[in-house]
């Protein structure tokens, strides 16, 4: 908590720790969810276990490899690019602050406490945020939301009644496309030769299948 007060003192216009507490109380009174404008929620992300998300270094490498030029561009690309910019800058400032606090704390136990708090609590939130926006840019927002809902249903289902493996994000678009393309040609363009040679019972059976 003291570290968070220090963050507020440095980053906002509150000149004292007492003022930062007032600022903190105001922030706590607001229902701020960074995922709501994108159709998700913090609770929806919380279904994914902490070890699901890649490390900060891996996520930064992914961002740099895929979206470096877009993030450096002065033009607005998408809300996801903007959110990534802000989250990356926030993490950089937090690392600078944690380093400064660690270097100025004489007690080794206090230094370890600061480092562990940042890595465990703030690090997880940053990893969740980066993963969400990177995935939305890579797979599409609707696919990511569908995955979060599917995983939430899977994880809440008792093991005896669910598939052994959790849903995989990268397979959702491919599976959906294959299903849509695989069924529609049979319904729309049946073979004329087949239609003439089939018995009435077979035709009725096919008609029922096409409605599924």
From Swiss-Prot:
Q: Where is this region: 3 X 8 AA repeats of S-P-R-R-R-R-S-Q?
A: 184-206
The keyword Secreted belongs to this UniProt entry's keyword annotation = yes
Q: Where does it localize? A: Secreted; Host nucleus
Q: How is it modified after translation?
A: Phosphorylated.
The entry's propeptide annotation covers 184-212
Question: Per the record, where is site Cleavage?
Answer: 183-184
Name the InterPro entries on file.
Hepatitis_B_virus_capsid_N, Hepatitis_core, Viral_capsid_core_dom_sf_HBV
Q: What does this protein do?
A: May regulate immune response to the intracellular capsid in acting as a T-cell tolerogen, by having an immunoregulatory effect which prevents destruction of infected cells by cytotoxic T-cells. This immune regulation may predispose to chronicity during perinatal infections and prevent severe liver injury during adult infections.
> How is this protein organized at the quaternary level?
Homodimerizes.
Instruction: Give the family per the record.
Output: Belongs to the orthohepadnavirus precore antigen family.
| Protein's UniProt name | External core antigen
Q: Which species is the source of this protein?
A: Hepatitis B virus genotype B1 subtype adw (isolate Japan/pJDW233/1988) (HBV-B)
Taxonomic lineage is: Viruses, Riboviria, Pararnavirae, Artverviricota, Revtraviricetes
